[in-house]
Amino acid sequence: KRNKKLGIGSAIRDGMNYALKKNYSVFITLDADLSHEPKEIPSFIKKIKKFDFVAGSRYMNGGTSNYKGYRDFVSRLANISCKFLLRIPFKEFTTSFRAYSNKSLKVLKKATLWSDGYSSQIEFIFFIYMSGLKCIEIPIQFHDRTKGNSKIPRLQAFYGALKLLELFIRRLLTKKK
């Protein structure tokens, strides 16, 4: 149990640490507001048997998103920027619908992870990909929330841009294993 809100990155790292402690073979994350379809979890489980990391993507062939207007523009721009600057062949870096093998959790445990907010999603992909683990994206259906408000603070875009700049510099200085 967490006593206060520390951000999605912090929450996922706590879950990862618990999964490592219990020696789980697979750790799956998805949005609790049903933006992600739980019925798609079997697709992740099937793929994680052959890969170390499986990321859902609403932007690859077969994926969908009902984002419209400004939010769609910002999301697509962020993901295109990540792909271009980090030189990682993914279509999406920002979704939390993912499956991690125990091996990928161990890589992240050893990495220096600083992001507590939404930029942690980019950071996780970066460290897993750069470690040389087998990664794949699969299409997902994304449904924007119908009730409640987004929990993304306004400063998150700024922090995300700083994180992307930091990872870009790391990418220039580091070779993929």
Language-model regions, residue ranges each:
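Conserved residues at the C-terminal ends of beta-strands
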Residues: 30, 57, 141
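Catalytic donor-sugar/metal-binding loop of nucleotide-sugar-dependent glycosyltransferases
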Residues: 89, 113-116, 125-143
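C-terminal catalytic/acceptor-binding lobe
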Residues: 132-177
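Residue-level signature of catalytic and energy-coupling elements of molecular machines
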Residues: 15, 33, 101, 128, ...
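Short loop/turn motifs at secondary-structure junctions
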Residues: 23-24, 50, 132-134
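Short beta-strand-to-loop acidic/aromatic patch adjacent to the donor-nucleotide binding site
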Residues: 24-33
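DNA-recognition element of transcription regulators
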Residues: 122
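Acceptor/aglycone-binding surface of glycosyltransferases and processive sugar-polymer synthases
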Residues: 3-21, 38-118, 145-162
